Amino acid sequence: MSIFNKVTKSFQWGQHKVTMETGEVARQASGAVVVDMDGTVVLATVVAKTDAKPGQDFFPLTVDYLEKTYAAGRIPGSFFKREGRPSEFETLTSRLIDRPIRPLFPEGFFNEVQVVIHVLSLNPEVEGDIPALIASSAALSISGIPFNGPIGAARVAYVDGQYVLNPGKTQLKDSKMDLVVAGTEAAVLMVESEAQQLSEEIMLGAVVFGHEQANIAINAIHELVRDAGKPVWDWQAPAKDEPLIAKVNELAGAKLQAAYQIRSKQARTQACRVAYADVMAALKADGVAFDGVTVEGMLFDIEAKIVRSQILAGEPRIDGRDTRTVRAIEIRNSVLPRTHGSALFTRGETQALVVTTLGTERDAQRIDALSGDYEDRFMLHYNMPPFATGETGRVGSPKRREIGHGRLAKRALIAVLPTKEEFPYTMRVVSEITESNGSSSMASVCGGCLSLMDAGVPMKAHVAGIAMGLIKEENRFAVLTDILGDEDHLGDMDFKVAGTTFGITALQMDIKIQGITKEIMQVALAQAKEARMHILGKMQEAMGEAKAEVSDFAPRLYVMKINPEKIRDVIGKGGAVIRALTEETGTQINIEEDGTITIASNDSAKADEAKRRIAEITAEVEIGKVYEGAITKILDFGALVNLLPGKDGLLHISQIAHERVEKVTDYLSEGQIVKVKVLETDEKGRVKLSMKALLDRPAQNQDQDRG
């Protein structure tokens, strides 16, 4: 009799077989599920505290996705030989799992919940994110914790005009899209994607296809819950204090209504703060017993009701716009004198200062990924300091949100970057958010595109991004173009679309409610396209095309090709030749296995000198050609003559002169410069030379020949 009560469910999902197990591993967690998807194995665990902390006013959910190097049969490369801080991929995957599960916890549930996912085994063809999403959903569903799931998730590719479910990494290379969709049986909750300028119809089709296929996983989770689910918690949302709600409404309603007639963000925020303080003071004066956190929640609900009802009634939005208008845009290029490229992009009260730096191949980021190491020649980093929203706060290493926003902006721009052959530079873009009132990641896309073009990067097209919002009450809904920060917090959807005039390059969607239909998404995509075209027009006015030349402060790259067999000659013994070349010419030289050499220098004369010397080193000795070189060594039977760097030939004693030569030193000395002709080379590469072939014969010899 086993001590384990193991339950297993398997299903075929596209080209993969998926197995879910519970009851054997991590039994002390509230819920634990192991998912095996064709050799990629993940363990998801969920633990929830039975009580919320007193005074808790938010839902403390943490999601940690952790990759173990043993999963790929590797030992960590760090000094300590153990896993360290999360990689960017781990952070992004943690966010990917958090986003669709967070809205499914009931309102008022403030107990701490921790979801931890370990990647235990990795098939390089099957990334860990989709199995991790499925395992997390299953672990939450069997745990008994209040959770309105399960959710399913799927990756969708677009290959040869067809949607492909959960493609392998190799297949993704041929795809024009990499899209992840997650949701319940009834509704899509999250979309994350990048694409190669695809139409709205193709993108929406992928979302619908992925959602349909995700239901296969949801059905399997339902079966697992039926056989292994724990009793559902007897949890009730805290009862609402209706008399206090009515009192707060009476005290604050008119004041907050007036505050939301103020168009300036800072003035409006200040008016709301005053209203909050007045309500607290009035409640104290009336002797009402209340919890400050609870009252703040009530005031937030009043704000949401005011804003949402105004929009659904067709009234102007918070800042006076209608639902389709983009805020005023100002663009300035080349704002920083000594950077390689820069742009200041301002849209309303959101502003991004974006700077591009060009580097050599050595500057590319080397990524030690679990599925294999690779180099990334395009980096985009997003920073949002607290002053951007007029606040004080911590300044330091990037938070999860900043990493996520940077990745979204990067996804948007990748599709239009030149290839390495077209533009061999490494590119780093940094977006400094200097003001924020909604959609700073999309401002980073616009500013990033302009900054790259300012740096002389030959982009295939301009890319613009726009953030859309949604307000929905029963059958009424309104899609909002270019949402403000407050509209993001108070709305039901955050929907970001980036692309060119030809199509979409990135799409991110986060939905807080059920009931978002395909038709609503269609309206949102069409409205987003209209806004994107408007912004692209402004960007094209400001900068029609990329600068023809890179900045004077950027390194110049010169590319040449050599025979791969000559690489060792350029490098030299122990790197002596390449080291001398770089030091003496003041250049950076990079050599690839196929014989491509990239020379980086700010001085074209130095680069030309490096090219000349490499050409000499790699040149082949030609039969019949005349060379001028120094004698490097005198031998009894001749002399060695240097023809090319690192290449000597033998001048035999019989080839020095027409007359008989008794002693080589009677004619030649070390260091002497002589002209020689190449007679032949043998199979070992040895070169035979002649001096006498270039000399006229003495007259008597000619007469004797005639006789």
From Swiss-Prot:
All residue ranges annotated as the KH domain in the record: 555-614
InterPro entries for this protein: ExoRNase_PH_dom1 (IPR001247), ExoRNase_PH_dom2 (IPR015847), ExoRNase_PH_dom2_sf (IPR036345), KH_dom (IPR004087), KH_dom_type_1 (IPR004088), KH_dom_type_1_sf (IPR036612), NA-bd_OB-fold (IPR012340), PNPase (IPR012162)
Enzyme class label: transferase
Cellular localisation: Cytoplasm
SMART domains: KH (SM00322), S1 (SM00316)
Statement: the UniProt record of this protein carries the keyword Zinc-finger: no
Keywords: Cytoplasm, Magnesium, Metal-binding, Nucleotidyltransferase, RNA-binding, Transferase
Cofactor(s) the protein requires to work: Mg(2+)
GO molecular function, one term: RNA binding
Principal cellular location given in the protein's record: cytoplasm
Entry EC number(s): 2.7.7.8
PANTHER family: POLYRIBONUCLEOTIDE NUCLEOTIDYLTRANSFERASE, POLYRIBONUCLEOTIDE NUCLEOTIDYLTRANSFERASE 1, MITOCHONDRIAL
Protein name: Polyribonucleotide nucleotidyltransferase
Naturally occurring in which organism (per UniProt): Polaromonas sp. (strain JS666 / ATCC BAA-500)
Source species taxonomy: Bacteria, Pseudomonadati, Pseudomonadota, Betaproteobacteria, Burkholderiales
